């Protein structure tokens, strides 16, 4: 009987808590809605747009967390909640009161809150960051934060100091950012140790009668890393099975040709049969490490890696991948792979860590243990939630400093938060290397122009006035 009464009491408390939270959230929405309607009529956005933009669809797979339990001890007032305005309509949320630990912030994509006195931070999605409309003039209490987990080729302007230092807070693939996303494609240590897809070496040796030692799967051809040129040259020295649109010489089953099938069990089973995989990133940047590296490690295939110069900091063990950068020419790389292919003892040295389930890299272990978000884990926040809460928490910290009469802490991004060298192209044999295509040429010229764009944008933002695209491009091509 006592247990039943306790359960009833607990249920009653939960109902009361939920009711209070719903009422508070509703009141916030009503009050902000009044402001929104007022601003909708008299908005002075620089581009003249007052209509809310649609959210992009490429991140729809990330589930947003709902508003969490409201702290009833804090006296509710509309002015109690800093507004975090997504200037890029990434989340698609017109308004949500989100709890971040002991703090709460109002998150929205609605630009009519630009002039609200409680708007404290503007959140940008790196790929969508452009000069068409920026929240200018920028007030002293307006923080800017950028979230950029995608390829550098999507927006080169961000990779130059004049632009990246416009932001107060960053979430990027760099370990140096305020919220590092370096391991964004790695679910957990357990998936690295898993033997689920591992094909025994004896079986792989038998499969070699019909399979090449190397496999290559890419459909994004001629990216800034110029990987296709390298692989094309490599193919003249060793057999490579290429399944993607780039350099294709082998076909996947029809049901696996869709790019969405790259994480399908059937695709994994095919790739796991190979001894080696060419894991080439589409761009060369410190800490830019994608599924191209982690996938083969999960499947028990040795990655032949080209991409992040800092990849050795993230290897599960010292001998878990073959690094292209250690070979002066594809011919030498091919010779080394043939040697491993013919010597089981040498090959097994690269998968020993997986067979034993031993990961010796403490940096990797620490990064996964301490990151504040999860990958495909319903029990953890995703990295967008973590980014929002990072900004919310830092904004609140400064509010509390000011309440004590102290100056707020000034946060600023550094150029190390996104670091990529200028793209280069491979040039091996003049007879086999194709002439520079328009796409291959584009990455180099685009990077060069982005330097001028970054300088022009910085000058205009520092001027702190609205500007037109004509004014921007006039500065870019001034010389």
Curated annotation (Swiss-Prot):
Query: Could you tell me which residue ranges are on the Cytoplasmic side of the membrane?
Result: 1-8
**What is the official name of this protein in its record?**
GDP-fucose protein O-fucosyltransferase 3
Cleavable signal peptide: none
Record's bilayer topology term: Single-pass type II membrane protein
Gene Ontology cellular-component annotations: endoplasmic reticulum; endoplasmic reticulum membrane; Golgi apparatus; Golgi membrane; lysosome; nucleoplasm
Function field: Protein O-fucosyltransferase that specifically catalyzes O-fucosylation of serine or threonine residues in EMI domains of target proteins, such as MMRN1, MMRN2 and EMID1. Attaches fucose through an O-glycosidic linkage. O-fucosylation of EMI domain-containing proteins may be required for facilitating protein folding and secretion. May also show alpha-(1,3)-fucosyltransferase activity toward the innermost N-acetyl glucosamine (GlcNAc) residue in biantennary N-glycan acceptors. However, this was tested with a library of synthetic substrates and this activity is unsure in vivo.
Please name the Pfam families in this protein's record.
Glyco_tran_10_N (PF17039), Glyco_transf_10 (PF00852)
Q: Which cysteines are joined by disulfide bonds?
A: 389-392
Tell me a GO biological process for this protein. Answer: protein folding
Pathway it acts in?
A: Protein modification; protein glycosylation
**Which is one GO molecular function term here?**
alpha-(1->3)-fucosyltransferase activity
- EC identifiers of the protein: 2.4.1.221, 2.4.1.-
């Amino acid at each position: 009987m006592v247990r039943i009464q306790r359960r009833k009491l607990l249920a009653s408390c939960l109902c009361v808590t939920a009711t209070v939270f719903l009422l508070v959230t509703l009141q916030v929405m009503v009050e902000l809605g009044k402001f929104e309607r007022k601003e909708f009529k008299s908005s002075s956005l620089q581009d003249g747009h007052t209509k809310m933009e649609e959210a992009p669809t490429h991140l729809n797979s990330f589930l947003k967390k709902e508003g969490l339990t409201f702290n009833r001890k804090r006296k509710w007032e509309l002015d109690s909640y800093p507004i975090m305005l997504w200037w890029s309509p990434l989340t698609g949320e017109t308004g949500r009161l989100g709890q971040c630990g002991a703090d709460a912030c109002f998150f929205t994509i609605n630009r009519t809150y630009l002039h609200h006195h409680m708007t404290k931070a503007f959140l940008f999605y790196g790929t969508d960051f452009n000069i068409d409309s920026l929240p200018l003039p920028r007030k002293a209490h307006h923080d800017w934060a950028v979230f950029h987990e995608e390829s550098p080729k999507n927006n080169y302007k961000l990779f130059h100091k004049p632009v990246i230092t416009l932001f107060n807070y960053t979430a990027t693939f760099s370990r140096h950012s305020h919220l590092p996303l370096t391991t964004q494609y790695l679910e957990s240590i357990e998936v690295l140790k898993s033997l689920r897809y591992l094909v025994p070496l004896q079986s792989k040796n038998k499969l070699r009668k019909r399979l090449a030692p190397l496999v290559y799967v890419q459909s994004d051809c001629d990216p800034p890393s110029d990987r296709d040129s390298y692989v094309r040259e490599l193919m003249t020295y060793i057999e490579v099975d290429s399944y993607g649109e780039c350099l294709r010489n082998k076909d996947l089953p029809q049901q696996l040709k869709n790019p969405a099938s790259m994480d399908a069990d059937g695709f994994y089973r095919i790739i796991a049969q190979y001894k080696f995989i060419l894991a080439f990133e589409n761009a060369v940047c410190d800490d830019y490490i994608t599924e191209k590296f982690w996938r083969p490690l999960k499947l028990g295939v040795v990655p032949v890696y080209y991409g992040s110069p800092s990849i050795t900091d993230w290897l599960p063990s010292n001998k878990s991948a073959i690094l292209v950068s250690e070979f002066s020419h594809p011919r030498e790389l091919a010779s080394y792979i043939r040697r491993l292919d013919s010597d089981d003892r040498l090959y097994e040295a690269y998968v020993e860590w997986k067979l034993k389930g031993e990961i010796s890299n403490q940096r990797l272990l620490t990064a996964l243990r301490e990151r504040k978000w999860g990958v495909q884990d319903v029990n953890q926040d995703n990295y967008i939630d973590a980014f929002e809460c990072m900004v919310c928490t830092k904004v609140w910290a400064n509010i509390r400093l000011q309440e004590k009469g102290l100056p707020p802490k000034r946060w600023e991004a550094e150029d190390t938060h996104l670091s990529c060298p200028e793209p280069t192209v491979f040039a091996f044999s003049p007879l086999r290397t194709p002439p520079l295509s328009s796409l291959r040429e584009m990455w180099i010229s685009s990077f060069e122009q982005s330097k001028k764009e970054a300088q022009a944008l910085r000058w205009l933002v520092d001027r702190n006035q609205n500007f037109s695209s004509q004014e921007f491009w006039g500065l870019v091509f001034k010389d």
